[in-house]
């Protein structure tokens, strides 16, 4: 029965004194609200550039500083560009002794990094010097004539990888030689082969460099090209090519002088016209051109030529007969050897059969 019993509420009677108290309470509430608003504005001015997070179960800020919401600082956007040193330091922190990575793996990462700090390079230098000293103490001195291939084989490198590495090295050397010993002119685009440059100066010049340097760069380019042309003109290769060309031209001139039997096309045409009688029978044309008659052999000379031809044919026949005889003799020897081999096989078969019969018996 007690659950259903309700407590009696005191009944408040409205009087003039109660109305005055209520008015005073309303004034106090309005003044407290104004003070709270002032605090909020001051907090906003102080915490400009920061944002506030309001939670779901949050109530009003009537209690002042006790009920203030926590302020979170503004998050800056991280730049996409990181320095190499920072990355290395972070990686080294990750690869500490607690991470469980081996020292070899860490050394590989150090070598592969683009820019290593001075601490790691010094350590590597010290370790390399120690290893070299140990190798010199332990290993015997190598002979002077040991080649690169022999050293690679001693290291345990397979032959295929060794051949590939040597080919790559030759290609790299060829490319470096092409860059150092060639000059490409910008006007014609031709490639000039120069003599060996022991100073290893860069002789290749591009249009971009000239345009960047301006007119002074163009003047330097012209002077440099003239110098290079002089070097090429006086180089051993150019002298060799010129001497070969001069010798070929001289030989051609001598051949033209020696070949008097072969008439030029104009002279042959004139000769045919004179034969036809186009120019008449004037002595100026007939005496000016020397007509060459064919060389006709006499009977004795023809007989001598025939005798020489017959003698040469007889000699050739004798040589052929000797070759045929030698071939026939070789064939006979081969046949005899084949017969001997056949007889030996027959004897072997007989001996094997005899041995088998004896073993069975």
From Swiss-Prot:
Q: Which GO terms describe its cellular component?
A: cytoplasm; cytosol; nucleus; U2-type post-mRNA release spliceosomal complex
Chain segments annotated as coiled-coil in the UniProt record: 295-349
Disulfide-bond pairs as recorded: none
Q: What's in the keyword line of the UniProt record? A: Coiled coil, Cytoplasm, Nucleus
Instruction: Tell me the compartments it is located in.
Output: Cytoplasm; Nucleus
Query: From which domain of life does this come?
Result: Eukaryota
* Start-end of Polar residues biased regions: 135-147
Official protein name in the record: Uncharacterized protein C17A2.08c
Organism, by scientific name, is Schizosaccharomyces pombe (strain 972 / ATCC 24843)
